[in-house]
Amino acid sequence: MPTPRMSMRKLKEVLRLKWACGLTHRQISRAIGISVGAVSKFAAQASQAGLDWAAAEAMSDDELDARLRPAATNAAATTTRRIEPDYTALHRELRRKGVTLQLLWEEYAEANPGQRTYRYTQFCQKYKDWAKSIKRSMRQQHRAGEKLFADFAGPTVPVLASDGGVEFEAHVFVAVLGASNYTFACATRTETMADWIGSLCDALEFIGGVPELLVPDNPKALIARPDRYEPGLGTTTQDFVNHYGTAMLPARPRKPQDKAKVEVGVQIVERWVLARLRHYRFYSLAELNKAIAELIADLNQRPFKRLEGNRREWFERLDQPVLRPLPVRRYEIATFQKCRVNIDYHVDVGGHYYSVPHSLARQEVWARITRHGVEILHGGKRVAAHARSRLKGKHTTIAEHMPAAHRAHMEWTPGRLLNWGASVGPGAEAVVRHLLTNKPHPEMGYRACLGLLSLARKYGKHRLEAACQRALKIGSPTRRSVLSILEAGLDLQPSLPTTPAEWRSPEHENVRGPDYYH
């Protein structure tokens, strides 16, 4: 059975995590849910196509697919012989501190893009056969600025109502940096997706930067497709990760080595913070979080028992210098909605209609909806952005999204129409003024005046002025009357023998007068 083709969205995420976040192929494999071989394959294709992350990010899905197709064809035509590693060099490099077979295999695969290389297990077995006695260690090592581990503590803290009864049990979120053990904690009402993402945002602001990886304890609130080996992030979770330019690697179930750091951190918070608060009464979440923040500050400045310094000093020395900068804006939780663009180049989001470029009419797009804004995405790229409106049945339209003819129509204001009428002649100006002030709705007057413009293009301004003068004299200054006069050629005949007094519209409640438009 053929391997299903990977989506362009997932391929872009591979390239972002590799080039923008600097993750290894195995870390990317776990984060996205594809094999390490597939990661290596697509990274090699992108390199052969001469791409970098800046170029790939700017491309639409179709452009990226077309760019990579030739590279994929060339890669498939390479020799089927596998590249043998240099076993002597492997044996020598393994003596260096921190170097593992995992790292050496990744370097071996990356050094031979587009070539057939050994999978990780084959690589290890062949080296073992050569060296006869090699043992691999699973010892956890955390580089500075690499990982922020996160989980919720087990015990909860009661928050009381004004009558002294328990209003709700607050849950305590804990985050720990891998290298320095610098710790953050805060309380939330629940453990929903909004609580998880909001607490992670608070943690990132607390440390003042962004690590390479976020490692939560595989929470259902963040994971759309639970899987022991290839968990899939939810759409909103992935959007949050993209906003901060990082990656998320949920800990595997029943794999304590994946989350040992945060489990120790949770235990310390329970003993150092929650145990000290057990006799206090809290009547709001803000009051509880203030008390937690004070104790966390003390915890981070508390000296280590077996090492020199404290968490704060280690953070300033190790993690802080290498953290990536925070984005300008804090992440705002977004929901996503698939939409089809209507024939009028607007999409329906919550009963309000937002414009997109008219070329996308009848196509499918995604709406990214936040509390304050609506973004429209097509082919992985943003094509429109609007302030969110709660007005049902109304339209929000950007002029640049409109066809040229529609845009020209919108640019004709009452003042501009009157100026145009005056440029034709006093008769045309009088007819335009009548049309603008005597139609039941302004839009009807605009359309009638635009009809006069089309008559000027067809018959010329001189004939239009003569027709307007005749329409005024017969007491019928309408577009239809002017058209009839022109079609019958009456404007070419001598003017009527008598000149009636200036025509005036009868007084009635629909008459606005020129001041209505100023």
UniProtKB/Swiss-Prot annotation:
Keywords recorded for this protein, A-Z: DNA recombination, DNA-binding, Plasmid, Transposable element, Transposition
Keyword DNA-binding: yes
Feature: DNA-binding region: 23-44
Start and end residues of each stretch annotated as Disordered: 496-518
Annotated Pfam families: Mu-transpos_C_2
Domain (Integrase catalytic): residue spans on this chain: 140-335
Annotated HTH IS408-type domain residues: 11-94
InterPro entries registered for this protein in UniProt: HTH_IS408/IS1162_type, Integrase_cat-core, IstA-like_C, RNaseH-like_sf, RNaseH_sf
Compositionally biased tracts (Basic and acidic residues): 504-518
Superkingdom field: Bacteria
UniProt GO MF annotations: DNA binding
A Gene Ontology biological process term: DNA integration
Family: Belongs to the transposase IS21/IS408/IS1162 family.
NCBIfam families: transpos_IS21
Purpose of the protein: Required for the transposition of the insertion element.
Protein name: Putative transposase for insertion sequence IS408
Originating species: Burkholderia multivorans (strain ATCC 17616 / 249)
